C-alpha cells in the first residue's frame, strides 16, 4: 500500500512549496492553506475544518471534506483524472475545478469560477449562487432550495430541483 497518512494541526504549503507523491495521500488537518503544488499520483483525501486554496491540487481521485469553509481562490486549480467529491458547509470557488465526475455538497455554494465534470456534474446545496460556469458534456444536476444563476449552466441534460430559481 503506497499511502501516506498525516494528521497535523495546521499546514501551510506556500507558493514555492511542493508536496509530491506517486502513491496516495490522506491528510487530516484542521486548517490547510495551499498556495503551492499538491500533486498525488493516486487518491488524495483532505479532511478538516477549512481549506484555503490558491495553488494547484491534482490527483487520480480527490475527496475533500471540510466542516467549515472550503475556498478555491482566483487562479487556483483543482483537478482529478477520475472523480472529485467536495463537501463543506460553505464552498466558494473562484478558480477552476475539473474532474471526469464532479460531485459537490454544501450548505452554501458560491461559484465565480469554473466547475466542470467532463462526464457528470452533481451539486447538492441549500443555497447556490453561480456567476461563473457549471459545465459538463453529460448530465448536470443541481439540487438547491435556492438557485441564483447569473452565469453559465451547460450540459447534455440539465436537471434543476429546488424551491426557487433566478436565472438573470
Predicted regions and their residues:
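Short "repeat-start/strand-capping" segments in structured domains, especially the N-termini
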Residues: 1-4, 21-25, 40-45, 58-63, ...
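Short, T/G/N/S-enriched strand-turn elements that build extracellular solenoid repeat scaffolds
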Residues: 14-20, 32-39, 51-58, 72-79, ...
